[in-house]
Structures are given as structure tokens and as C-alpha cells.
Amino acid sequence: MPGQKPVVLFLTNSEFGQSSVVLAVAQELVRQSACEVHVASFSALKQQVEALNVAFHALPGRSMKEALCDSGLPFLPKHAPGTRGAVESYRKGLQHVVAPWEPAGYEPIYRACLDLLDKLNPDLVAVDPLFGPGQDACNVRQCRYLVLSPASFKDHLVQVQPHLRVLWKYPVISSGLPCPLPLFLIIINFYLIFKLVLHTFLSKRVQTLTKWRNHIGIPGDLTTIYANFNEKVPWLLPSIPQSDFPLKIPTNVTGCGPIIPPFESVAHNPTASWLAQRPTILFNLGSHMKYKLTDAQQVVTALSMVLHTYPDMQILWKCELSHDDPSSKEPESSDSSAIQDLIPAELTDRIRVTSWITPSPMSILAHDSTIMYVHHGGSNSFHEALAAGVAQVVCPVWLDTYDVAARVEFLRVGLRGNGKAAPHLEGSELGAAICRTAHRLRSGDMGTRTRELQAHILAQEEGVSGTGPADVYGVGRRKAAKVILDMITA
């Protein structure tokens, strides 16, 4: 109808690691008021979507996280790097990531996506690459769609690199191998790729779901398998060429820069005055990390080493105790006191412990006092740190987080914090990694690199309308929104 706004529909998993880029781009589209925005996901995402004044459509069935729990997995199982750990991750973890639902759980979600496409008749659909029912529905209905991913170039493009570089140049997921691969590790990479194909792509779970899909009229293999990169649809990613390993980027892929939702400034938060006192390290291993007291003690050992070496620094530590820990008899209400008892008295004013970071981790990273981010290697954390221009210490625990650890070292913007102890932490090893990173910041070379990458992110802004040229945190979402608007108005 004349004057009616075009409709953009986002189909996504509800887990924040996947949906954060959807929330960011949806909010930017709403800000520009150029289209009608809808988001379809599971009920866990409803409150966040509706807070953006965006129409939310609840999907039936189990979310990805719930489906993994139904399979007996604690979301994603931790594993060690190296040959044995990687093979174990393919056997127990990765096949469930690409096929979290069995046919009985997949079908109602897929049917609901079909119904929603028929009802809304969107001008464009943006799909989460790990949300298979959504991509299948778009392909069956022959909708115009693109893929919006929080992951890196390497995650999606390694298998389409020329000259079989997937085999001999880039470390396979879960391996913890460096990039570029030294000659003596190439044979191990070969072996792990074979095991990945065997235990993931050719697993009974994946093959059963694939055959069922084909039987009900869905063509091809699972769209969630990274090896099935679709060169016929546009892709939007938070990577830029300077923030990843050297790769050949197909013309249907747009690197936007970090795709970060708008966030509240820390200026009016009680934390602001504490942050302003000293250079600050943010230590946040993610919401999945629940510490046993023995793990917390290792962190305290590391932080004590750092603060005795650098008496002008302080650390904000997100720490929540696991109440499944048999070694801890502390009730939940005494988490804070149990952790505080581990911290040396002379350091209590320089280690602030919190069970939840307010206003948000991004708010802390954006503060002028923050100089370093210690995190688990999630793609969102990595890209947030790049945008903030801070150094990184990565403590990987599973799958692609080992790639992120290799990536920060390759880019010279950080170090790995648990090279020997992964997927766990060992105090002296972690403390030494943080100290080395701090030294390189103070000596200038790492600080120069983080600022260079931040400048490359800002350079993506050309031709994109925004709030100002210095708003590095909005570059990615604005560029992604521009691609979407260009597509629906072409």
C-alpha cells in the first residue's frame, strides 16, 4: 500500500550471544524510523525486544539452550584444547550446536516460522546463522533474506578459502592451535578436520535431522553447519579485515565492525567514582561462569600478583559462586563475604567484587579508566574490547573461544591467560599473562595496536549516518542497518 513502511523480520535464537547483534540492529532501524521491525524468537527474549518498542513474536518449543539441556549438556560443555579435547568437543558439543533440536522439536519451530512469513510477508528477513528453522523457512518460502551473525569472518569463511587453506593455514575450531599453523602442526590440523567431519557433519544426530528435513520438503543439508556457507545471500558480520586472520572475503559478505547495542553511560552509576580512581581491569568470564571456591582462589592468586606488581591499578571482578559446589557450605546470600574472605586485606580497596556488572560490561569498557578486559573468548566480548580500544586477556573454555585466544595474540592486542590450564584457571599462569599484557600496554606497543584497530573500526563509518564520527560503538549497527535499508529500497 502507498505510504506503508517496508517490513523487516528478524529470526533469531534467544541466547544473548546470538541475539545481541539482532537487538543492536533492530534498535538502530527503529531509531531511523524507516521500516516496520519485527523480531521472532523464544520467550526469553521477549522483554528485551519489547523494551525497544519492536513487535515480538514468540516461537513455540524449546530454545537452543533448553534443547541442549534436554540433551544433558550444561549449555556448551567445557573442554581442553589439543587433539583429545577437540575431538571430545566434536563428539559431545559441536554436533549439538549445529543440531540442537531433534525432528520432533524442530518441526513446530519451523512451522511457526513458515506461518509468520506468510502472515507478515516481510520485505526482508535477517536470520541468525545458528537458527536453522528460520533459514529453512526462508529457503522453502523463497523469501528475500540475509544472515546476521555475531561471529567472525574465519568462523564462516574458512572453508571457502582458496588453495585448501582450511587444511594447512587456519587452526580448526576447538584445537587451540596458533595461526598461521607451523609446519609440524599441519598434520594434526588435518586429523582434527577429519574428526570434526566424522563426529559432527556425519554424526547420527545430524544425519537424522538432515534426512527428516529432506523428507518433509526442506532441501539440502543443515544450514547451521558452517561448512555450508551460502554464497547466494548477503551476510553481515562484526569483523573487519583488520580484526581477523588474513582471509579472502567474498563479495556477498559485509564486515560492519563490532555490532553493539546502545548502552547506558556509567557516568551516573555509583561505580563511576570508583573507576575514576585508577587504571582498571575488567575481569568478566561471562554469565555461564559460576565459580567454585577453589576456582575463585586461583583468580585471587592471579589478581594479587597483578596488583602487587602494579600498585596503581585496580580490578572489577564479576564473580558468582556455584551452589553446586560441595566444597562450599555458604548460603547464596553470603557469596560476597565468602569471596571477600579470600582477598588479602591490603587489596580489598582495589578489588571490587560484584555478581552482576552495572550498568553493563560495555559501559565499563567504554570508561576512560578501563585499560584491559579479561574474558572467556566470546565473540561479543572480543569485538566489544576492540571497539573500546582496550587490551585483552582471553581464557578460552570451548569451541570458537580457542580461536579468539589465537586471534588476540595474532593481532597483538592481547594474550591467552590459561594456555596450560585450559579450560580451567591457574593463578600464577593467569597472573603472569595479565602482568605481561599490562607491561606491553605500558611500553606502548600493545596500546598502539588497540588504538590502530579502533581507528580501523571508525573508518567503516564513511557514508553511514550516525550521531557523530567519534561514536565508535555505533559503527557496526549503523553499517548493518544501512545495508538492510539499501536492500529494501533498491
UniProtKB/Swiss-Prot annotation:
Glycosylated sites: N252
A single GO BP: antibiotic biosynthetic process
Alphabetically ordered keywords of this record: Antibiotic biosynthesis, Glycoprotein, Glycosyltransferase, Membrane, Transferase, Transmembrane, Transmembrane helix
Enzyme Commission number, as recorded: 2.4.1.-
Gene Ontology CC: membrane
Pathway: Mycotoxin biosynthesis
Pfam families with a match to the protein in the record: UDPGT
Localisation: Membrane
Signal peptide region: none
Primary enzyme class: transferase
Membrane-spanning segments: 181-201
Source species, domain of life: Eukaryota
Keyword Transmembrane: yes
Membrane topology: Single-pass membrane protein
Keyword Glycosyltransferase attached: yes
GO MF term list: UDP-glycosyltransferase activity
Classification via InterPro entries: UDP-glycosyltransferase (IPR050271), UDP_glucos_trans (IPR002213)
Xref: SUPFAM superfamilies: UDP-Glycosyltransferase/glycogen phosphorylase
UniProt record similarity statement: Belongs to the UDP-glycosyltransferase family.
Reported function: Glycosyltransferase; part of the gene cluster that mediates the biosynthesis of burnettramic acids, an unusual class of bolaamphiphilic pyrrolizidinediones that display potent antibacterial, antifungal, and cytotoxic activities. The first step of the biosynthesis of burnettramic acids is the hydroxylation of proline by the proline hydroxylase buaE to generate 4-hydroxyproline. The PKS-NRPS buaA and trans-enoyl reductase buaC construct the highly reduced polyketide chain, and the condensation (C) domain of buaA then catalyzes the amide bond formation with the activated 4-hydroxyproline.
Record's protein name: Glycosyltransferase buaB
Source organism per UniProt: Petromyces alliaceus
Upper lineage: Eukaryota, Fungi, Dikarya, Ascomycota, Pezizomycotina
